[in-house]
Amino acid sequence: MVLSVIGNLGSDAELVNIKGKKYMHMNVACNEQRKKDNGDQAEVTYWCSVYFKESSKMLEYLKKGKRIYASGTCRINTTVKEGKCYLDISLFAQCFQLL
């Protein structure tokens, strides 16, 4: 599945090693406006882990609060904690841009 996200970094980007390959990792908050049953607007935040092939030169610019765009292959896993179901959204980006 291909997914595109626009959102703000929840923390500074970091380099991580996954199965011997280096990636830049970012936690991205994506906000959505929804109407409640009573008609009021509510903002819902989704968190997405974005991985991009190592680009250590960009790390100095990718600080908490910066806005980014990323598009790529999406993996979604579910976990159950204390009876609640949580989604873990991971995006392995082929396209990435600092906004």
What annotation goes with each model-predicted range?
Residues M1-L99:
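Single-stranded nucleic acid-binding surfaces, predominantly the OB-fold ssDNA-binding core
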